Amino acid sequence: MAKRSRNMESNSERSSRPKKKSKGDAKPEQPPYVQSAELDAVPQSEIDDFLKSNTIQISDPSIKETLRPITAFSYLPSDSNQLYGPLEHFSKPTPIQSVTWPYLFAGRDVIGVAETGSGKTLAFGVPCIRKVLEINASHSSFRISAVIITPTRELAMQIHDQLVKFTPNGVGLACIYGGASKDDQRRALKKASVIVATPGRLKDFHSDESLNLKKVKYLVLDEADRMLDKGFEQDIKDIVSAMPSSRKRQTVMFTATWPISVRKLATTFMKEPVTVTIGGDLSSDIRANTRIKQIVEVVKPENKESRLLSLLNQYQRGRNAMDKVLVFCLYKKEATRIERFIRSKGFKVAGIHGDMNQTERFNSLDAFKSGSVPVLVATDVAARGLDIPAVKLVLNVTFPLTVEDYVHRIGRTGRAGSDGLAITMFTENDKALSGGLVNILKGANQDIPEALLKFGTTVKKKQHDSYGAFFREADTMKTATKIKFDD
């Protein structure tokens, strides 16, 4: 059920002004956010319906009033830099954009918990560029004012490509990640106001003094849960320690799940954050996109390839021959074998996995995105964050090591408000994860096959080295470890 403050009623003079603080504690100054008169005129019943229909919860630890969601682009605060021009290609803001924008424009720290494909990049990106433009207006020299940290190079490049469209002349935007020329990236950093980066390369550049983070006023931790899963917690702490304190910096965190580890990270880096949850409640560690129809088939391991061929013949023939299909495998050599198998059956297919060099990965993704190759076989390197338009079907040939990864895999379809389909092969070898998978299916109102229920519905207790024992609603396994199996 949507929650709202009793202070959400109309008020055309409403603005969000930070509480007075001592000079040493003050957040970076910026014009106060003033709600537009047009938004102020929207009946309260429409605001209530919007929050309820999108299952939105807003939690604010401060005494400040709850700000009305910006449900139309015409309600955005005035801007003299034509920042909003690219938004003309969209009909309206997504729920996560609508609710977080007012708080971000007001300078508040924000935590956004939302499914994949919900429009998070522009949710943090538009306020980011607006803030940097305000900072640059009062400083003639180049300075790094905003840093966006993300777990993978593919996601870093994707965010960069989206933000370029909103970046006017005078705002340098650099994308830094491993596997590319450091010299080229250093040159880009010299003129950068905004950096999109992976943790490892960002830490490298800070360690060798190629960049200065002392003037950062806007920090984004995108897919924070995934960065912790990948072991970047200490790198992130080292990077953030080089920035101004949380009282002098606006910090934004977006995450698809809300486990204890992410909550502790938020406590460490943020100051009185507003927490916005879309499509669920904070007691749920993970949730699946309800627009995705999930079909789970219990099969024998030796029957996977024949079933895969049958599904491709069903969904990739005739008028559907160019529909995008994303096929997930667990191991690199398995992905290579499946790619060859699919190609041998006459389908156009490409692959992406960790053994491929950067150029090969780019070429595969570009071919898939353009539609020239409609089938892509991937390991989990492609499962998180990549915004590949119009993926009609996700096929899980091998179940991942965690149900979190399952949710992020299937989240490659059903994006930007569209419907999607995900078909998963589940074997006896995966039965330790059956309880977690059942919870995911239940939470999204999906059919649960009897064969899956026979494996059990118990979600086991989980141990974490740092946080002890706790229960996870949708995970039955300990943290995934690297296994040499089919590699």
UniProtKB/Swiss-Prot annotation:
Residues 101-276 form the Helicase ATP-binding domain. The gene is DBP3. The keyword Flavoprotein does not apply. One of its GO terms (biological process) is rRNA processing. It comes from Ajellomyces capsulatus (strain NAm1 / WU24) (Darling's disease fungus). GO terms for cellular component: nucleolus. This is ATP-dependent RNA helicase DBP3. Gene3D superfamilies: P-loop containing nucleotide triphosphate hydrolases (3.40.50.300). It is found in: Nucleus, Nucleolus. Its EC number is 3.6.4.13. Pfam families: DEAD, Helicase_C.
